[in-house]
């Protein structure tokens, strides 16, 4: 009996290691992709690479650690969203609202950020390598005065 129990426990443990638990809510990811409306959604760690999220409502959404590489977020409302540690490599953020957003540790490598509103956003440890930034309050050392 003990041997069988140990085999079952060992099998379950190996399954957990093979299929890591994902933090995002799959229904909310689908809701976002289908409707572009997901205010307050839990999208932590979501894989949204290449997603077309033009004009998306992501106010107060939790996108901590999400992969938004090459995502189109033109005109998206990310007011008060948590993007800490998110990957926005080569993302397109023209006219996006990032008011009061947590952008700490975000990777903006090669991102296009034109006329985005970052009023009150937290921007510590962001990576702006090769990013194209125009008309936006992001500069070396933080927000422009």
Regions found by a protein language model. Give the residues of each.
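Bacterial N-terminal signal peptides that target proteins for export
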Residues: 1-7
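Tandem repeat scaffolds
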Residues: 2, 22-145
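Short helix-onset patch at the extreme N-terminus, typifying the N->h transition
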Residues: 7-9, 145
